[in-house]
């Protein structure tokens, strides 16, 4: 899908049967979720963001469904203010940031001496003329 940025890009994700809302965050390296129980082993990790550093549990090879697309990757679980899907999973989804096509550049044209540009037929005008 194409998502505009007039609102936060929040999507529904499914992690181990648990439905959550998460923010698609191209500025985040990692995916961080809170209040979620994941099976398997985890490793402790510290991550830093604008709000400082937080301690998280790192789970590898986690299956997540994002907007109906299944991906497998590393998920960090900890006290994040908002669940974020970082670049580690966005790249697997094939997400890209696209900028609109820039305005068409004009090319200056040199006219032959004595020419004052192209002649354009005048459209029919009403009484004002």
Language model segments and positions:
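Aspartic protease core domain of the pepsin/retropepsin superfamily
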Residues: 18-22, 26-127
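A short acidic-Thr-Gly-centered motif at the start of a beta-strand
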Residues: 8-20
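Residues embedded in well-ordered secondary-structure elements
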Residues: 2, 11-12, 53, 64
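A detector of low-complexity, intrinsically disordered, Ser/Thr/Gly/Pro/Ala-rich segments
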Residues: 1-2, 10, 104, 124
């Amino acid at each position: 899908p194409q998502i505009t940025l007039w609102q936060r890009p929040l999507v529904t994700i499914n992690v181990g049967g648990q439905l959550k809302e998460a923010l698609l965050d191209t500025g985040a390296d990692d995916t961080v979720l809170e209040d979620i129980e994941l099976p398997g082993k985890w490793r402790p990790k510290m991550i830093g963001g604008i709000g400082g550093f937080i301690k998280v549990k790192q789970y590898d090879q986690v299956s997540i469904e994002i907007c109906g697309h299944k991906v497998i990757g590393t998920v960090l679980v900890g006290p994040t203010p908002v669940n974020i899907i970082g670049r580690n999973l966005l790249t697997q989804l094939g997400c890209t940031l696209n900028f609109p096509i820039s305005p068409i550049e004009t090319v200056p044209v040199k006219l032959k001496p004595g020419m004052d540009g192209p002649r354009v037929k005048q459209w029919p005008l009403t009484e004002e003329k």
